[in-house]
């Protein structure tokens, strides 16, 4: 199978073809996703909650991300593999570069970092040194203590304009992808149309170029609170492989996420 690349997603945006992505943390699920044609995966710091059982992503370490990245890469050798840099792993550009090198050696094609304009120098440093960067704006879970919980971001003109400004700044600095989490559909549309790079949404409506879900949400095995934007595809299909295919089909057709999964 031909490897999926950042250029593959850029072409999807140009062709207005929606694409699905998903989190993965181990060999077996990564192989299953790849076998079904789901070839863009994220080793997210969400593993702190879904795999390790913490109540936030904050305890996750670079070593944790590298371990799971290596496992996923073995299961999906041709996927486009993103890896989160966890909390406090990119407080300075130099620290970001050192930690990015660790997860890239483990098998990542790209690192994802949370934050806006304050990350411009970090994004420049990484991209100039051949480390592709995916930005992450909106609800950034590593900032949960500042936000006071998991809340929709970017409501109101001022907040929306700031997120758009952040997105443009990250793109100008060299970011090649952007994740938008828990923002109003109207703002997600503005940002997606303003950027040349692909935008991946989670809780941002069906107006972004791609979608991502935490795999546990997609299969209905999340403990505790279920996010509004989540959909249990396993409940509808009764089979994990069929659930993956259904998720991909609904994203590509624009059926998912629906109005019931979106914010305004």
Swiss-Prot record:
Example GO BP: pantothenate biosynthetic process
Note describing how the cofactor binds: Binds 1 Mg(2+) ion per subunit.
Cofactor(s) needed: Mg(2+)
One annotated GO molecular function: 3-methyl-2-oxobutanoate hydroxymethyltransferase activity
SUPFAM superfamilies recorded: Phosphoenolpyruvate/pyruvate domain
Catalytic residues (UniProt): 181 (proton acceptor)
Gene3D superfamilies, A to Z: Phosphoenolpyruvate-binding domains (3.20.20.60)
Binding site for Mg(2+): 45, 84, 114
Signal peptide: none
UniProt GO cellular component terms: cytoplasm
Reactions listed under catalytic activity: 3-methyl-2-oxobutanoate + (6R)-5,10-methylene-5,6,7,8-tetrahydrofolate + H2O = 2-dehydropantoate + (6S)-5,6,7,8-tetrahydrofolate
Pathway, per record: Cofactor biosynthesis; (R)-pantothenate biosynthesis; (R)-pantoate from 3-methyl-2-oxobutanoate: step 1/2
Job of this protein: Catalyzes the reversible reaction in which hydroxymethyl group from 5,10-methylenetetrahydrofolate is transferred onto alpha-ketoisovalerate to form ketopantoate.
The protein's assembly and partners: Homodecamer; pentamer of dimers.
Record protein name field: 3-methyl-2-oxobutanoate hydroxymethyltransferase
Protein's organism: Shigella boydii serotype 18 (strain CDC 3083-94 / BS512)
Gene: panB
């Amino acid at each position: 199978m031909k490897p999926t690349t950042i250029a593959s997603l850029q072409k999807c945006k140009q062709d207005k073809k929606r694409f699905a992505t998903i989190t993965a943390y181990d060999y077996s699920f990564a192989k299953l996703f790849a076998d079904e044609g789901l070839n863009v995966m994220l080793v997210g710091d969400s593993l702190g909650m879904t795999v390790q059982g913490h109540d936030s992503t904050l305890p996750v370490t670079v070593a944790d991300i590298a371990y799971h990245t290596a496992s996923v890469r073995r299961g999906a050798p041709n996927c486009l593999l993103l890896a989160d840099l966890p909390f406090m792993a990119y407080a300075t550009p130099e620290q970001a570069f050192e930690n990015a090198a660790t997860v890239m050696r483990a098998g990542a094609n790209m690192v994802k970092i949370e934050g806006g304009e304050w990350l411009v120098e970090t994004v420049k440093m990484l991209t100039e040194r051949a480390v592709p960067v995916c930005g992450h704006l909106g609800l950034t879970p590593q900032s949960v203590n500042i936000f006071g919980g998991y809340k929709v971001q970017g409501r109101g003109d001022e907040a929306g304009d700031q997120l758009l400004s952040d997105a443009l700044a990250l793109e100008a600095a060299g970011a090649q992808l952007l994740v938008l989490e828990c923002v109003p559909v109207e703002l997600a549309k503005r940002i997606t149309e303003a950027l040349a790079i692909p935008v991946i949404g989670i809780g941002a409506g069906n107006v972004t170029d791609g979608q991502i879900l935490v795999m546990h949400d997609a299969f209905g095995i999340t403990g505790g609170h279920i996010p509004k934007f989540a959909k249990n595809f396993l409940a509808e299909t009764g089979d994990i492989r069929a659930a993956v295919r259904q998720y991909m089909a609904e994203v590509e057709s624009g059926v998912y996420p629906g109005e019931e999964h979106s914010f305004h």
